[in-house]
């Protein structure tokens, strides 16, 4: 499984990009929100690797919460990667959480390919959907954030650096975030 890519963007279109990693070029499908967030040549993407009988696809995300949202959506009945990426393109993760919590069928119907019945079913199946990290990872992120704040870094810098981190324990998160903040 490919869970992340770090490399150079060779071609960028609104719904996909080509990224070169170690001499190999990957086609990675992205949401419109991710496309808008990618503004540099060197990038790090969280990915979901989908292997089917007749195809293999990579879906990339700048924001880990968008990846979680996508991963949760593709587990639902009748929601494939195309519909899931359309939802990710239409709503940012926090907006989607609110839509699910409010059971807002009208908003979900705005997504291309989702009608009233599909919207209702998705909202019922998601139930109490939340994109927050698991308790362990979430507390590690909170502790790392507090540690970095105590070192005098701004919340915006910390948030941006932590979103790009792959570590799950506090000490590793702080180390990785410090390296990323230095590059900002």
From Swiss-Prot:
InterPro entries documented for this protein: DNA_helicase_Holl-junc_RuvA_I, Hlx-hairpin-Hlx_DNA-bd_motif, NA-bd_OB-fold, RuvA, RuvA_2-like, RuvA_C, RuvA_C_sf
Gene3D superfamilies reported for this sequence: 5' to 3' exonuclease, C-terminal subdomain, DNA helicase RuvA subunit, C-terminal domain, Nucleic acid-binding proteins
Region listing for Domain III, in residue ranges: 136-184
Keywords: Cytoplasm, DNA damage, DNA recombination, DNA repair, DNA-binding
Region (Flexible linker): 134-135
Protein localization: Cytoplasm
GO molecular function, one term: four-way junction DNA binding
CDD domains associated with the record: UBA_RuvA_C (cd14332)
GO CC annotation, single: Holliday junction helicase complex
Region (Domain II), start-end ranges: 63-134
Domain notes: Has three domains with a flexible linker between the domains II and III and assumes an 'L' shape. Domain III is highly mobile and contacts RuvB.
Complex formation: Homotetramer. Forms an RuvA(8)-RuvB(12)-Holliday junction (HJ) complex. HJ DNA is sandwiched between 2 RuvA tetramers; dsDNA enters through RuvA and exits via RuvB. An RuvB hexamer assembles on each DNA strand where it exits the tetramer. Each RuvB hexamer is contacted by two RuvA subunits (via domain III) on 2 adjacent RuvB subunits; this complex drives branch migration. In the full resolvosome a probable DNA-RuvA(4)-RuvB(12)-RuvC(2) complex forms which resolves the HJ.
Protein name: Holliday junction branch migration complex subunit RuvA
Organism: Nitratiruptor sp. (strain SB155-2)
The organism's taxonomic lineage, starting at the top: Bacteria, Pseudomonadati, Campylobacterota, Epsilonproteobacteria, Nautiliales
